[in-house]
Amino acid sequence: MPASTLNDLLEAGVTGRTVLIRSDLNVPLDGDTVTDDGRIRASLPAIRDLAEAGARVIVMAHLGRPKGEPDPAYSLRPVAARMAELLGADVALAADVTGDDARAQAAALQDGQVLLLENVRFDARETSKDDAERAALAGEMAALAGEDGAYVGDAFGAVHRKHASVFDVAAQLPAYQGPLVAAELEVLTRLTESPEQPYVVVLGGSKVSDKLAVIDNLLDKADTLLIGGGMLFTFLKAQGHEVGASLLEEDQLDTVRAYLRRSEAGAARIVLPTDIVMASGFAADAEHEVLAADALTSGAHGASAMGLDIGPETARAFAEQIRGAQTVFWNGPMGVFEFPAFAEGTRAVARALTEASAAGGLSVVGGGDSAAAVRTLGFADDAFGHISTGGGASLEYLEGKELPGVTALAGEGRA
C-alpha cells in the first residue's frame, strides 16, 4: 500500500497538533561550526511547511556514532543554531532525547514552534538489536506528541537503519512519508525500473567490499560501470597487474574476477582506468607521477608507490562515457579529493555529470563522500539532476534490499 504523505497530513490539518519528524541532520562539524549544511537545507521544507501550518514540530535526528550515551562532541547544538539561521525562526534544543527536559519543552510548545531533541543516539535503545528496547524508546517518543500526534519520516539518509526513531515509532503514531524521502525514492525508482539508455554507473571510494552487492545488481541493469577510487586496485590485481602499496582487498579477488567474467559474457561493460596517479605516500604534498595501469610499480618509488587518483587519460575517457549517457549514477570519489593534487579525477567526473545533466540526461550523485566532494570542489547542487542525502540508503536500494524506514511508512496513515 502506498505511504500517506506529508501533503495528506497537511490537508487533514495540523494546527494545534504535535508532529514528530525524523530528519537527516548528520552533518560534518569543525568544532561548533557546520562545514556542510546540505542535509539541513534539504530537511527544512518539511519542517517549515509543518510550522507554517500551525503544527507544534518536534524534530528528531542523529549525529555521528556516539556510544549510546551523551557525548558533547556529538551534540546537536551547532545544528540547532544553523537550522535557526536558515529557518529564520527560533529552534529550541532539548537537553535530552525523551527525558525531563524533552518532555517539559514538548509540553510547552506553541503552534508554529520548533523543538529539536538532542541526538537520538545518546540513548542506547535507538540502535538496539532488541525489538522491545527500541519499541520502548519509540513509545516515549510518541508520548511527546500526545494523543493527536503524528509522525513524519523524512530522513532518507537513515531509512536503511532499523532504529527506534526511523522504524519503530512509525508503528505507534499515524505515519507519513516526508517529501525528501518521496523525492529520493522517485529518482531511485527511475534508476532501477526504467533508466533511459545509455545507463552509466560510476563507482569509486576506498573499498570494493562496500560495493559488492550493488555491482552484482547493476551488472544486469546498467550498460557501463566505470571503476575508480581505491577499489579499482582490487580489479587491477584481479587482472594480474601489480598495484604497489595501493589499497587492496585480497579476500575479494575471486569475487571481482567473477564480475569481470560476467561483464565479458555480456553483462554491463566494466571499464577500468588505463593510467593512475601514483604517489610516494598518503599525503597532500607527496611526490607523484602518472603511470600506466599495467606498470604501476615502474616509477620512481617502485613497489612502495600508492595510487591516489585516476590519471588524466582515464579522466578524459570516463568523462566522455558520462557525457554520452542518458542516465548516470555516481557513488564514490575517484581519488583522494581532499588533497588538491589528487582531486582532478573526481573533478572531471563531477564536471561531466553536470554536462550530462545540462544536455537533458538524468545525473544522480549518490550521497556520502560523492556529495561532499562536489561541494568541496565548488560545484553547485542544482548543476546535477539529483544529489542524494543518503549514500548508504541509496546503495542498499540499488542492491534491491528492503529499507526499514520506507516499509514502516507504507501502512495507511490516518489524520
Swiss-Prot record:
It catalyses: (2R)-3-phosphoglycerate + ATP = (2R)-3-phospho-glyceroyl phosphate + ADP. GO terms for molecular function: ADP binding; ATP binding; phosphoglycerate kinase activity. SUPFAM superfamilies: Phosphoglycerate kinase. Keywords: ATP-binding, Cytoplasm, Glycolysis, Kinase, Nucleotide-binding, Transferase. It is found in: Cytoplasm. GO terms for biological process: gluconeogenesis; glycolytic process. Its EC number is 2.7.2.3. Substrate binds at residues 24-26, 39, 62-65, 121, 161. Transmembrane segments: none annotated. It holds the Pfam family PGK. InterPro entries: Phosphoglycerate_kinase (IPR001576), Phosphoglycerate_kinase_CS (IPR015911), Phosphoglycerate_kinase_N (IPR015824), Phosphoglycerate_kinase_sf (IPR036043). Its main location: cytoplasm. PROSITE patterns: PGLYCERATE_KINASE (PS00111). It is an enzyme of class 2 (transferase). GO terms for cellular component: cytosol. ATP binds at residues 211, 307, 338, 367-370. Pathway: Carbohydrate degradation; glycolysis; pyruvate from D-glyceraldehyde 3-phosphate: step 2/5. Monomer. Belongs to the phosphoglycerate kinase family. This is Phosphoglycerate kinase. The gene is pgk.
